[in-house]
Regions:
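N-terminal pre-domains immediately preceding structured catalytic cores
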Residues: 2-204
Length: 204
């Protein structure tokens, strides 16, 4: 699909949704295109999730994704949130906006787009759910009618880096924890604003 057609498709999806999103024209499934078939780098210990002080004006039970902080914040109470480390979009795949969780899947399957397979010919046409090299990992939260997801990963060493094609990538154990907390319909705000959230005295 050409870039203009992708742009038109993205605009059509946004117009059909009840939520405003500003996005670059890019296939959004969160896959680091050069992982499949490449040697895996030495993995560093996974950064943990932790409770932070969060702006008191935000009501609980909503998600803020800060691409600047490379954190996903699940607001648990006024002034408190759980901060999870994420991999953020590449510069050419950046987007911001407000969406809602439209569906949830355990062990989602993955179908790479034609452009992804052109960029990386090693990609298969389809990866079943539960496969150890499924880029969506063990859980996925689908955002509105877009291609954006909050999901796990088969490449945990990419967490903390700007590598995805638009999706919000998390460690599998973190997205599994988030999955059990977040119902369908949850508001998700994606932004490049930094919240500079700090750990409180007591940890989660």
């Amino acid at each position: 699909m050409s870039v203009p057609r992708l742009r038109r498709a993205a605009l059509a999806l946004a117009a059909a949704s009840a939520f405003a999103v500003t996005a670059q024209p890019a296939a959004a499934q969160g896959f680091f295109l050069f992982d499949w078939g490449s040697p895996q780098p030495t993995q560093q210990p996974a950064a943990d999730a932790y409770v932070v002080r969060f702006p008191h004006r935000f009501a609980p039970r909503q998600i803020f994704v800060s691409f600047a902080d490379r954190k996903l914040y699940w607001v648990t109470a006024r002034g408190r949130a759980i901060a999870y480390p994420i991999a953020s979009p590449r510069a050419q795949s950046s987007w911001t906006g407000v969406l809602r969780v439209s569906q949830k899947k355990v062990n989602p399957s993955w179908t790479p787009t034609a452009s992804m397979r052109r960029e990386n010919p090693r990609l298969p046409a389809f990866v079943p759910g539960g496969h150890p090299q499924n880029p969506l990992g063990n859980r996925a939260l689908y955002l509105g009618s877009t291609l954006y997801r909050i999901h796990g990963t088969d490449a945990p060493w990419t967490i903390g880096r700007p590598v995805s094609k638009g999706c919000v990538r998390m460690h599998n154990h973190h997205v599994a924890d988030l999955y059990r907390r977040v119902p369908v319909g949850t508001k998700v705000t994606a932004t490049y604003k930094s919240f500079r959230a700090r750990k409180p005295a007591a940890y989660w």
